[in-house]
């Protein structure tokens, strides 16, 4: 999965965001496992996945804060 753009994330529903976070967490787990066994070729993908998760969580929190105001 390529780096996610904020515009794409903002267009997602909360359920889609939850699904995206879950799939990114699974991907991160697999990437960490590959790194530990020496099979990981694209080491920057670990950082991208971590930041994508943070980006989605941030936008989800902003959406929730906007609904409560």
Curated annotation (Swiss-Prot):
<dbReference type="GO" id="GO:0006412">
    <property type="term" value="P:translation"/>
</dbReference>
<comment type="similarity">
    <text>Belongs to the universal ribosomal protein uL29 family.</text>
</comment>
<protein>
    <recommendedName>
        <fullName>Large ribosomal subunit protein uL29</fullName>
    </recommendedName>
</protein>
<dbReference type="InterPro" id="IPR001854">
    <property type="entry name" value="Ribosomal_uL29"/>
</dbReference>
<dbReference type="GO" id="GO:0003735">
    <property type="term" value="F:structural constituent of ribosome"/>
</dbReference>
<dbReference type="GO" id="GO:0022625">
    <property type="term" value="C:cytosolic large ribosomal subunit"/>
</dbReference>
<keyword id="KW-0689">Ribosomal protein</keyword>
<keyword id="KW-0687">Ribonucleoprotein</keyword>
<dbReference type="InterPro" id="IPR018254">
    <property type="entry name" value="Ribosomal_uL29_CS"/>
</dbReference>
<dbReference type="Pfam" id="PF00831">
    <property type="entry name" value="Ribosomal_L29"/>
</dbReference>
<dbReference type="InterPro" id="IPR050063">
    <property type="entry name" value="Ribosomal_protein_uL29"/>
</dbReference>
<dbReference type="InterPro" id="IPR036049">
    <property type="entry name" value="Ribosomal_uL29_sf"/>
</dbReference>
């Amino acid at each position: 999965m390529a780096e996610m753009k904020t515009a794409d994330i903002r267009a997602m529903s909360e359920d889609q965001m939850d699904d995206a976070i879950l799939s990114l967490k699974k991907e991160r787990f697999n990437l960490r496992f590959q790194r530990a066994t020496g099979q990981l070729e694209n080491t920057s993908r670990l950082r991208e996945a971590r930041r994508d998760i943070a980006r989605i969580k941030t936008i989800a929190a902003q959406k929730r804060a906007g609904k409560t105001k």
